[in-house]
UniProtKB/Swiss-Prot annotation:
Pfam families xref list: zf-C2H2
Outcome, altering residue 122 to Y: Suppresses activity
Main location: nucleus
Consequence when changing residue 109 to Y: Suppresses activity
Chain ranges of zinc fingers (C2H2-type): 104-126, 132-155
GO biological process: cellular response to ethanol; chromatin organization; peroxisome organization; positive regulation of ethanol catabolic process; positive regulation of fatty acid beta-oxidation; positive regulation of peroxisome organization; positive regulation of transcription by RNA polymerase II; regulation of transcription by RNA polymerase II
Gene Ontology molecular function: DNA-binding transcription factor activity, RNA polymerase II-specific; molecular adaptor activity; nucleic acid binding; RNA polymerase II cis-regulatory region sequence-specific DNA binding; RNA polymerase II-specific DNA-binding transcription factor binding; sequence-specific DNA binding; TFIIB-class transcription factor binding; TFIID-class transcription factor complex binding
In-chain residues carrying the UniProt-annotated modification Phosphothreonine: 188, 193, 259, 327
Function text: Required for transcriptional activation of glucose-repressible alcohol dehydrogenase (ADH2).
Gene name for this UniProt entry: ADR1
Record key words, sorted: Activator, DNA-binding, Metal-binding, Nucleus, Phosphoprotein, Repeat, Transcription, Transcription regulation, Zinc, Zinc-finger
Protein name in UniProt: Regulatory protein ADR1
Length: 1323
């Protein structure tokens, strides 16, 4: 090779005169020349070998240690790809052509980048992700600027109706791409132990300089990736922007910027944040010596900020609704009011970057099912609800049909004027058996009319199975009479009835329900075994002579296997009623003596056929029949109904409250759904009297008629008894009685299969009873771990019944049945409206159940109610509308308030429009979004930086003048439940990203494994060893968890106003309105996340997160610890500061400290304790603080870094300075100083305005505050993590003792007790 002299340029690379060494004409062949130099060989390579007449070469230098440096900085160049090793200038700490340091490393191929956005864009070459689809042609792009260029060139700047969030999966990949980047299979890196399936992993010391990859989603891959200028905020207005005229319908928030410089000052709110401008180290008595160095890196924004006006188009800002809309109370006629324009600009001064940050989502798809979001949506046009729409076209659909019958007063459709009265049940109950004489039987039937029940048809026997309670298609008059006004103005109305074109086979549904009622016998059996073991132990300890007790006593202690089948009569157990339970007058009147006797009659029927060896239909465990179940008195049953109405219905209003005030006739009309044909009944009576169906037993017919009346009321009383303190055993017995009655109905129905039954109603009472049965089984399961197979079987039976009965009748069929010229749905009576609305609510409730089990317990099953099932149903009406109607009222037409389907209603929020959400629908919409948009970047309500969209859509201001106190209270409870659920799901999203088997471990009671793999800071520490994105996701989940936990205990409302000028301490009580079955399980995970943060912070303190620690300490000291230590003082004996505070509260000034006078004690300890109790957590201020942390970390990935080695021992100030008044309100004051009475650090006049100044001040003045003692860690000084474990354990114990007898709470309290032992063992 020829030697060429290489003058050096400023970059350090030798310069070669290529024109003197090579001639022109490199045609399609790669040219190489190696030149010998004094220091290292140089390789010249053509970088464009496929192009003609190319004189462009790359210079590659080999260093003495064998490393390669090249002048070609193109990551995808063929030259760099053909090298054996990646050039050093493209690796970590290499330099870009502009001289910037490459500090962001790809964990797949080790290539490094100077900007994080470049790394994230590079990851798409491994994942083939193209997150920017064209709304017209579905072509996908890796960057948004490419999408805009495409739209400008191909579609004349038109982005289509919508920028779809779906990402089309490539079906074909070119052969060349298969052999290159597309063949790289990228897997999300796993963190933590290799056997738990986590997505976190141990990282090296430079982890903070790496960005976590996005989810592994298969996308189409561009054929060629080239370097383009970043579409940043500074160039957004001029870079590849199409004509604005073609984009008028698209708001600016749909353009996502690559790396916006987020401004933390936009989050500042002086009113919320003013109390945090004090020295936070004084609150913790913390001294920082001068040798303690802390990383104080602030984000370097280079003076570049983003100044955008976040505005929606005028048409969007003026988006109002007609009078039929539920939002008219919010918008009204004044479109210039504040609420008339729903956009995010009203929330904060700069809202665009909040959306940009929320869209910058780091997530891992957790669904193993095909999400509806992954399906093509182009065939279905998105319909924004027009609130004037009603049913206009009555067309057939695949799943249901509309049949129209003109009411022309014909004899066929006219109900007989001499319609028989309802049955007198008291007389029916006096006849235990019907005579065998045919004439006597006929007389009884005609006298009582058998409840007008169509359970037994007079048609000939058939081998086909026609289940009466599930048949939808044979109704002569529809159960829902929708009045459709004739447009010509005539008086003739049309009765619209629902029917099935293709009725499904109902036999399987009935079998599942019967099997379900058998399964839940295990609850009663497990309870009896526990009671028997308990009584056996008591008997053994009470006497040394093991003598058998007389028959008048309770059970023998030999076990259930030794119980005879004879009835053992015993008295009810003595109740340990809590005297704190408020007494109230009984309001419900549903139960009376005739109904109680009806319950007893069905129970006797159950026992009779269970004991009869020839009758095996009940299939009951004979050992369980040895215990006689005593029906409570009428007054007790009505009291349980009151508890059900006050504690269950406000959270789950699936049953109309007026049902609890019905008489027996009205209840019968409700169970029959107000629809029967008198002529058909007459035909039935004739066939029965003629003996056509000789094999049919009339006693069975009685049981069918009676059991459907009493089943739902008894289930309601059972659930209400859960809230009766001290009645645990009676609750289990009530549930067993309810189960037997339900089982009697189902088995008797199945027994009558040989008789063709013509029951045209969907039996809403049955679905409501099944829901209550399932909920009770969930909360009262006595097994140590939840039986997932039992839950699946029960919920599968419920979902199958609802899918067969409810879904066809409540489907809106939005594509064919709704248009802008329609009128609202109208019902002939309030009862018909309530039944129709109840079916919608039961369906949504079943959907919520399925999502709850899937999210919180990792229980999935094929027959669950899925998103596609609820998308087409009508949404429920507002609670004010629901409560205003009554089952008792009759004779007036009722119009449905909301008549648009679930899917279109949800998607109407995706464009920034906010309008009223029906309160009961809120939870279902949150579950729908959580499951639908899992693993995607687009969210409506579940944003990492909370934009309060959900809260604003659930605003209750319109209900202020209703003069309906009870209704308004229930509305507030439903809204709170929706917000609590949103916070819980935001926490669950992070937990499932960390460990997908986490919820399964909780379900199986494996708290020890959770501690080892998740809570143990030695093995997993988010503040030390993990990427900034993982830490930010953790802080997001922590923020929402703190919101929930801070609302568990509240001050009494009367105290809030009276205590302003009163020295008395506040009175705090359990917030019962925030408690429900769904919420309690979410609180469990919220406590787990808070404890995890405290453990990590105590192990490796990060002082930029010090404020979170202080706020959690304020929450514990001011509310949680004083309340729980008063109830359970022995549990806090290991915390001297808690004992000190509680003794002071109890004895006021009676406790003196040795060596001090009473005056000194009062002036010192009293003031300090009251100051400590007065420090409340500032939830909104803490949320602003965490959001600022997220913004700074987004701009600077090293913002939260800590220097090594991390120090965990500090000198806490315990000096002798006296307490004096501060010139400003001290929200972050010092600890109560339980090491002594003088509380140091409180009177220092130096006050800082940020954590940064706090730390500097602590270092400069550490010599003043040092006590010369041994250093302490945060865990040793405050024991805050251990305190919160104890708080969690006692909270669930307190809820069980004072709110609901739920065995699920025992499991939760037991988990935290186990965790408490782990922490104490490691301390």
């Amino acid at each position: 090779m020829a030697n060429v002299e290489k003058p050096n340029d400023c970059s350090g690379f030798p310069v070669v005169d290529l024109n003197s060494c090579f001639s022109n004409g490199f045609n399609n062949e790669k040219q190489e020349i190696e030149m010998e130099t004094d220091d290292s060989p140089i390789l010249l390579m053509s970088s464009s070998a496929s192009r003609e007449n190319s004189n462009t070469f790359s210079v590659i230098q080999r260093t003495p240690d064998g490393k390669i440096i090249t002048t070609n900085n193109n990551m995808n160049s063929k030259i760099n790809k053909q090298l054996d090793k990646l050039p050093e200038n493209l690796r970590l700490n290499g330099r870009t052509p502009s001289g910037k340091l490459r500090s962001f490393v790809c964990e797949v191929c080790t290539r490094a980048f100077a900007r994080q956005e470049h790394l994230k864009r590079h990851y798409r070459s491994h994942t083939n992700e193209k997150p920017y689809p064209c709304g017209l042609c579905n072509r996908c792009f890796t960057r948004r600027d490419l999408l805009i260029r495409h739209a400008q060139k191909i579609h004349s700047g038109n982005l289509g109706e919508t920028i779809s969030h779906t990402k089309k999966v490539s079906r074909t990949i070119t052969k060349a791409r298969k052999n290159s980047a597309s063949s790289v299979k990228f897997q999300t890196p796993t963190y933590g132990t290799p056997d738990n399936g986590n997505f976190l992993n141990r990282t090296t010391a430079n982890t903070r300089r790496k960005a976590s990859p996005e989810a592994n989603v298969k996308r189409k891959y561009l054929k060629k990736l080239t370097r383009r200028a970043s579409f940043s905020a500074q160039s957004a207005s001029s870079y590849a922007l199409p004509d604005q005229s073609s984009l008028e319908q698209h708001p600016k928030d749909r353009v996502k910027f690559s790396t916006p410089e987020l401004v933390p000052l936009d989050l500042k709110n002086p009113e919320l944040d003013s109390s945090f401008d004090l020295n936070m180290n004084l609150d913790l008595n913390l001294n920082l010596d001068s040798n303690f160095n802390i990383a104080l890196n602030r984000s370097d924004s280079s003076g570049s900020t983003m100044n955008l006006d976040y505005k929606l188009p005028e048409s969007a800002n003026n988006y109002t609704y007609s009078s039929g809309s539920p939002t008219r109370a919010y918008v009204g006629a004044n479109t210039n009011s504040k609420n008339a324009s729903f956009n995010d600009a009203d929330l904060l001064s700069s809202s665009y970057w909040i959306k940009a940050y929320n869209d910058h989502l780091f997530s891992v798809s957790e669904s193993d099912e095909t999400s509806p979001m992954n399906s093509e949506l182009n065939d279905t046009k998105l319909i924004v609800p027009d609130f004037k729409s009603t049913i206009h076209h009555l067309k057939d659909s695949r799943s249901s049909s509309w049949t129209v019958a003109i009411d022309n007063n014909s004899n066929n459709n006219k109900v007989s004027d001499n319609q028989p009265d309802f049955v007198d049940f008291q007389e029916l109950l006096d006849n235990d058996t019907l005579g065998n004489d045919l004439l006597e039987t006929t007389a009884v039937l005609k006298e009582f009319e058998l409840l007008h029940d169509d359970s037994v048809s007079a048609t000939a026997t058939s081998n086909e199975i026609d289940l009466s309670h599930l048949n939808l298609s044979n109704s002569p008059i529809s159960p829902h009479k929708l009045i459709y006004k004739n447009k010509e103005g005539t008086n003739d109305d049309m009765l619209i009835s629902f029917g099935l074109d293709h009725p499904s086979n109902r036999e399987d549904d009935l079998d599942k329900l019967c099997n379900m009622t058998r399964d839940v016998q295990a609850i009663f059996s497990q309870y009896l075994k526990g009671e028997e073991s308990k009584r056996s132990l008591e008997d053994f300890l009470s006497t040394s002579n093991r003598k058998e007790k007389p028959d008048s006593g309770n059970y023998t202690f030999y076990g259930l296997d030794c119980l005879t089948l004879s009835k053992i009569s015993r008295a009810l157990p003595a109740s340990t009623v809590n005297n704190n339970q408020p007494s109230h007058s009984i309001e419900s009147k549903l139960f009376n003596e005739p109904m109680r006797n009806m319950c007893i009659k069905v129970l006797r029927y159950y026992e009779k056929f269970s004991h009869d060896s020839s009758e095996s239909v009940m299939d009951s465990n004979p050992n369980l029949l040895s215990k006689e179940l005593l029906m409570p008195a009428v007054s007790e049953l009505n009291e349980y109904l009151d508890l059900f109405k006050n504690n269950f219905l406000p959270h789950f209003p699936i049953i109309h409250p007026s049902l609890l005030d019905l008489d027996l006739d009205s209840l019968q009309r409700y169970t029959n759904e107000d629809g029967y044909d008198d002529a058909e009944n007459a035909q039935l009576f004739d066939r029965l009297s003629q003996g056509t169906d000789k094999e049919y037993d009339y006693e069975h017919y009685q049981i069918l008629s009676i059991s459907k009346i009493v089943c739902l009321p008894l289930f309601m009383a059972t659930f209400g008894s859960l809230h009766k303190f001290g009645y645990k055993s009676q609750t289990i017995e009530l549930y067993e009685m309810s189960r037997r009655i339900l089982h009697s109905f189902l088995e008797t129905k199945r027994r009558c299969r040989s008789t063709t039954v013509n029951d045209s109603y969907q039996n809403i009472w049955l679905m409501q009873s099944l829901i209550l049965s399932f909920m009770f089984a969930l909360v009262a399961d006595y097994l140590e771990k939840i039986d997932s197979s039992l839950m699946k079987r029960q919920l599968s039976a419920l979902c199958s019944t609802i899918r067969s009965n409810c879904l066809p009748t409540i489907s809106a069929n939005s594509e064919k049945s709704i248009n802008n010229n329609n009128e609202p749905l109208t019902f002939g009576s309030p009862l018909q409206y309530i039944i129709f609305e109840s079916k919608i609510r039961c369906t949504l409730m079943a959907y919520d159940f399925c999502q709850f089990l899937k999210c919180f317990f990792h229980i999935k099953f094929d027959l669950s109610i899925k998103e596609k099932d609820v998308e087409t149903i009508y949404i429920p009406d507002n609670e004010s509308k629901w409560a205003s109607e009554s089952i008792i009222c009759n004779g007036h037409v009722v119009q449905k308030q909301n008549f648009y389907d679930f899917r279109n209603f949800y998607y109407s929020f995706t464009y920034g429009h906010l309008h009223s959400i029906p309160e009961f629908l809120g939870s279902s919409m949150i579950y729908y979004e959580y499951d639908l948009r899992k693993g995607t970047k687009s969210h409506v309500f579940l944003d990492r930086i909370d934009t309060k969209r959900l809260e604003r859509s659930l605003d209750t201001s319109s209900y202020g003048n209703d003069n309906m106190a009870a209704t308004n209270k229930n509305i507030a409870i439903l809204i709170d439940d929706t917000i609590i659920l949103k916070n819980n799901l935001m926490s669950m999203r992070f937990i499932k990203q960390i460990d997908r088997s986490f919820t399964e471990k909780v379900r199986k009671g494996q708290i020890a494994k959770i501690y080892d793999s998740f809570l143990n800071s030695v093995r997993l520490n988010f503040l030390k060893n993990y990427s900034v994105e993982v830490l930010c996701e953790f802080l997001v989940a922590l923020n929402f968890s703190i919101r929930n936990i801070s609302s568990l205990y509240v001050e009494e409302e009367s105290d809030c106003s009276q205590r302003m000028n009163s020295p008395e301490l506040p009175r705090i009580h359990l917030n019962n309105q925030a408690l429900s079955v769904f919420n309690l399980q979410g609180y469990y995970y919220c406590f787990i996340l808070i404890i995890k943060f405290l453990l990590d912070f105590e192990a490796t303190p990060n002082f930029k997160l010090l404020r979170i620690f202080i706020e959690l300490r304020s929450l514990a000291n001011s509310i949680l610890l004083p309340t729980l230590s008063r109830l359970y003082p022995q549990e806090f004996s290991g915390f001297p500061d808690v004992v000190f505070t509680q003794q002071f509260i109890n004895k006021d000034n009676g406790m003196l400290v040795p060596g001090l006078s009473a005056n000194e004690h009062h002036n010192g300890a009293s003031a300090a304790v009251k100051t400590k109790l007065a420090k409340k957590i500032n939830v909104e201020g803490l949320a602003m603080f965490i959001n600022e942390i997220l913004v700074n970390s987004f701009n600077d990935t090293s913002f939260l870094n800590m220097e090594d080695p991390i120090r965990n021992e500090f000198s806490f100030d315990n000096g002798d300075r006296a307490v004096t008044d501060l010139p400003r309100s001290a929200h972050f004051l010092s600890d109560t100083g339980l090491e002594g009475i003088n509380f140091s650090g409180l009177n220092d006049s130096h006050q800082t305005v940020s954590t940064l100044n706090l730390l500097r001040y602590g270092e400069n003045h550490s010599s003043k505050h040092k006590n010369g003692g041994k250093g302490q860690g945060f865990a040793e000084k405050y024991q805050l993590s251990l305190k919160y474990v104890t708080i969690a354990k006692l909270f669930f114990t307190n809820v069980k003792e004072n709110y609901i007898h739920c065995h699920m709470l025992d499991k939760m309290a037991s988990d935290f007790h186990t965790l408490e032992n782990h922490l104490k063992g490691n301390s």
